[in-house]
Amino acid sequence: MPSVLVIDDDLFVLATVGDVLRSAGYTVLTVQSPAEAFHLDLSGISAILCDYNMPEMNGSDVLVAMRELQECRAPFIFLTGHSDLDDLIPVAIRYGAELLPKPVDPTELTRLLRRQLAA
């Protein structure tokens, strides 16, 4: 069963996304900050969903750190309510990440995650 790490500073988003993914059959690990995520063993993580706008660091920085410093190659999906994506799109393209707008549509979330895991 694939394991998904969800990083978001909003407890409601963590609970909602976690419930959707568990209902779809995924094992879910949720953390409220990038610092918590960086202390995890990411080797068993199948995919990462990460909020873009967090106080500690933004999602682009999290993605770069995971790819370059932690050598984590799991598919990465940005969750964002941010309307100005000019700084996010180049990073997403460079690292092959996807974007999913908030509020998260459960059907779109599971479809996108299945597609990422199949790639």
Task: Pin down the residues of each PLM region.
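Acidic, metal-coordinating helix/loop segments flanking the phosphotransfer/catalytic sites
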Residues: 30-47
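Active-site residues of response regulator receiver
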Residues: 51, 80
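Receiver (REC) domain active-site loop signature in two-component systems and cognate sites
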Residues: 54
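C-terminal output helix
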Residues: 95, 104-113
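His-Asp phosphorelay/catalytic-motif detector in bacterial-type signaling
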Residues: 44, 70-76
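Charged docking surfaces used in two-component/phosphorelay signaling
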Residues: 15-19, 23
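Short acidic/polar segment at the start of the alpha1 helix of CheY-like receiver
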Residues: 10-14
